[in-house]
Curated annotation (Swiss-Prot):
Localization annotation: Nucleus; Cytoplasm; Endosome
Native source organism of the sequence: Mus musculus
Keyword Cytoplasm: yes
Alphabetical list of Pfam families matching this protein: SH2, SH3_1
The name this protein goes by in its record: GRB2-related adaptor protein 2
Keyword tags: Acetylation, Cytoplasm, Endosome, Nucleus, Phosphoprotein, Repeat, SH2 domain, SH3 domain
Modified residues (N6-acetyllysine): K106
Family to which this protein belongs: Belongs to the GRB2/sem-5/DRK family.
Location of Phosphoserine modifications: S186, S230
Length: 322
């Protein structure tokens, strides 16, 4: 999600994010009065009443995979929602109504913070959704994203556009007063009975959730999943017959994590062509055998082919134990 800063905010805690009026923030999660956001290469928590944000109708962060399927099965082809990934905390999944079922795709992110499903990359989820409204999200069938907002003539409705602690109109029409910051619970000392004023609003009971573990660095700057086929393979069962089930079925029988328990993966055979779009990636053709140098990350491995070293997506290859 994208949000626009309405006021300057100076971070006072290590887990907070500073910004200036007019900055465009990338919202990563909704945490009541505080939101986790990204600006440039920095991440942190920001006060909700300092920013202007509209949550589209297709954004359902807390919905599970099963709930998404129940919701979308009663909709037309192309209806979708974006939700928090159950298998990868901090990431998103997109669930789309197809002809016979609901398909789930993991929204990938590269090292620059761009979002993508296939090879096209976008600076925000909003831009990704806009692109697949006119370009098929399916590689085998024509499936375009839709959520009913086209018929309404606007891009979704605001859900609680301003929190109760947000700015209120002043005596001048159209003027806003800079809001006070409702500090996080960890920023306050406990108040005794004699310290509480009957007209004073208590601080919101907010404590930042657990942070996803930082992944091992690869080639000095690799921190997270980057790109490639984006089926949410670890987020539950997907019906047979989908365009990405070849990868899914293969990983069910040759999951790299399971193979690592038996022994380190040293060689892998390419199942599909992979085109390297970044300098540190390793491209290959279907059928080629890649020497695996590091398979500790479940999503991207380090390998060598034709005397070239680089990263490649683990679900594009079949591990070989030899």
């Amino acid at each position: 999600m994208e949000a626009t800063a309405k006021f300057d905010f100076m971070a006072s805690g290590e887990d907070e994010l500073s910004f200036r009026t007019g900055d465009i923030l990338k919202i990563l999660s909704n945490q009541e009065e505080w939101l986790k956001a990204e600006l440039g290469s920095q991440e942190g928590y920001v006060p909700k009443n300092f920013i202007d944000i509209e949550f589209p109708e297709w954004f359902h962060e807390g919905l599970s995979r099963h709930q998404a399927e129940n919701l979308l099965m009663g909709k037309d082809i192309g209806f979708f929602i974006i939700r928090a990934s159950q298998s990868s905390p901090g990431d998103f999944s997109i669930s789309v109504r197809h002809e016979d079922d609901v398909q789930h795709f993991k929204v990938m992110r590269d090292t620059k913070g761009n979002y993508f499903l296939w090879t096209e990359k976008f600076p925000s989820l909003n831009k990704l959704v806009d692109y697949y409204r006119t370009t098929s999200i399916s590689k085998q069938k024509q499936v375009f994203l839709r959520d009913g907002t086209q018929d309404q003539g606007h891009r979704g409705n605001s859900l609680d556009r301003r929190s109760q602690g947000g700015p209120h109109p002043s005596g001048t029409v159209g003027e806003e007063i800079r809001p006070s910051v409702n500090r996080k619970l960890s920023d306050h000392l406990p108040l005794g009975p004699q310290q509480f004023h009957p007209h004073q609003q208590p601080s919101p009971q907010f404590t930042p959730g657990p942070q996803p573990p930082q992944q091992q660095r690869y080639l000095q700057h690799f921190h997270q999943d980057r790109r490639g086929g984006s089926l949410d393979i670890n987020d539950g069962h997907c019906g047979l017959g989908s365009e990405v089930n070849a990868t899914l079925m293969h990983r069910r029988h040759t999951d790299p994590v399971q193979l690592q328990a038996a022994g380190r993966v040293r060689w892998a055979r390419a199942l599909y062509d992979f085109e390297a779009l970044e300098e540190d990636e390793l491209g290959f053709r279907s059928g080629e055998v890649v020497e695996v140098l590091d398979s500790s990350n479940p999503s991207w491995w380090t390998g060598r082919l034709h005397n070239k070293l680089g990263l490649f997506p683990a679900n594009y290859v079949a591990p070989m134990m030899r």
